Amino acid sequence: MADLLNYRKEDSDMNYNINEQKLGFDRVLPWEGQVPALVKEGEHYFLQVKAPEAEKVTFTMNEEEFPCTREDDGIWRMEYTLRTGIQYVQLKIDDVEVVTPLLPITYGYSRPYNYVALEMKNEEFYQVKDVPHGSVRREYFFSKVTEEWESCIVYTPYCYEEETEREFPVLYLQHGHGENEIGWTASGKVNFILDNLIAEKKAVPMVIVMSNG
């Protein structure tokens, strides 16, 4: 319990803002008996999970499975060597897929899926910066086409509520196969990307509509 109480955000040297998920804006802290899923030691990152009863633990990335090494304390770990900022990862314990709340969660491969988000100096375009931020909301509507209740996620720029007479362009974003509408704002960071582009005057303020199709 002492290790859990002493675990602080600043100890990880990683940006919490880009790890936002539906379970909360801040990262989910490890409960008693568990360890953080992603840690940084010096210049190296490690994926890990405590599973003392397991016989095999792997992480899958880019459809390639990487084995973990078991340590004496029952922690399985592997060095995370990929240097892409955002990467889908899948934890398997004894060949059973596990979605861990200790990593951010998105939707990919037609199911809930974990991902890793690192703060990369050459990929700052999706970072949370000190610029005016838009809003992300979920809208609900009844569709006469499907004759069912439907939902979509809508991004509005920072000036949307104030400039009520202004007509904003609308971008409709459609996800790829096996994904759904949450991917654009979860692992995709589209709201932060557009916030930054608007602040840099590289994009005009616009509305983005993201639906599950």
Give the residues covered by each predicted segment:
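Non-catalytic cap/lid and distal C-terminal segments of serine-dependent acyl enzymes
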Residues: 3-29, 33-66, 70-213
